[in-house]
Amino acid sequence: MRVDLFDFDLPEERIALRPVEPRDHAKLLHVRPGEPFEDRHVYDLFDLLQPGDALVFNDTKVIPAQLEGMRERTGNISQVSATLHMRVGPDRWKAFLRPAKRVKEGDRIRFGHSGTSCFLGTLDATVAEKGDSGEALLVFDLSGAVLDEAIAAVGHIPLPPYIASKRPEDERDRKDYQTVYAREEGAVAAPTAGLHFTPDLLEKIKARGIEEHFVTLHVGAGTFLPVKADDTGDHKMHAEIGHVSQRTASALNAVHERGGRIICVGTTSLRLIESATGEDGVVRPWSGATDIFITPGYRFRAVDLLMTNFHLPRSTLFMLVSAFSGLDTMHAAYNYAIADGYRFYSYGDASLLERIDHDRHSA
């Protein structure tokens, strides 16, 4: 499909730079294909679901993966930024470097030495490989838990570009840009639909007889990369590491067997559950990388509803929601949301989407 089919105009003032407080007071647009849109709030969510349904959350935890460093070469020092996006070994991370043209294989980069001292000593890395789109493989001198502590000491929360271009990261972001149930460290970006949940809302949902299950997908910096291709068939997704346990897979299959619905909180949960589901509609344990790219025409195997924020024009995430609820429906929903003052992107409001075809299909 042509990428320009997923374009729309978004006034800059609709981009949220801070979340609402409390978290669950964000607006929630209920989208049911073929029916009028309904304005709600996130705290209404348990009224929109049914006992026996199951919510699926991504429990990944954002790490301070934005590093500032100096590339040192004989007689030449240059400033370099690195956004870590996938751990591939105890001492190895794939990262996006900026500006990448200043770096070549074999270069040494010293992180955390400009205004911030690394209390564990130097946080240095070697550029082992260079790839496309500014991607590189960094091999650090530190390893394992010691490396994790050093990154936490000198790193910054990698705010999305549309926020970072407007203001710097601060201490409030370390709390705001993290779900209340985050526990598995490794994400570069937050699973933002989950940012709306409070402990009190989670308790109310559970009390209504709605199950809560957790999966892990470490969201990578590739989620911020623009789609540069003119056709969706020419776009390549960056892989992300995920895990679905046997217990969670069995529980979700039981939900469908008794007629309940699976509601994914966020596109990351949806992409992982769909990756773990076979053509027979059975969710299976999963551990590994997924680069699933969902566009209109995809036949969903497991997920019945999706709670998600409002996404960028021409983005893979707007393509995903268009596959889920229909391209025309989503254009209409976004036009409605823009006119009605909904806040967009990571710190913005949310939508609850029902699938355009409520029968589960094989892919």
Swiss-Prot record:
It catalyses: 7-aminomethyl-7-carbaguanosine(34) in tRNA + S-adenosyl-L-methionine = epoxyqueuosine(34) in tRNA + adenine + L-methionine + 2 H(+). The gene is queA. Its main location: cytoplasm. Pathway: tRNA modification; tRNA-queuosine biosynthesis. The keyword Transmembrane does not apply. Its EC number is 2.4.99.17. The keyword Lyase does not apply. It comes from the Bacteria. InterPro entries: QueA, QueA_dom1, QueA_dom2, QueA_sf. Transfers and isomerizes the ribose moiety from AdoMet to the 7-aminomethyl group of 7-deazaguanine (preQ1-tRNA) to give epoxyqueuosine (oQ-tRNA). One of its GO terms (molecular function) is S-adenosylmethionine:tRNA ribosyltransferase-isomerase activity. Monomer. GO terms for cellular component: cytoplasm. Belongs to the QueA family. Keywords: Cytoplasm, Queuosine biosynthesis, S-adenosyl-L-methionine, Transferase. PANTHER family: S-ADENOSYLMETHIONINE:TRNA RIBOSYLTRANSFERASE-ISOMERASE. It is found in: Cytoplasm. This is S-adenosylmethionine:tRNA ribosyltransferase-isomerase. One of its GO terms (biological process) is queuosine biosynthetic process.
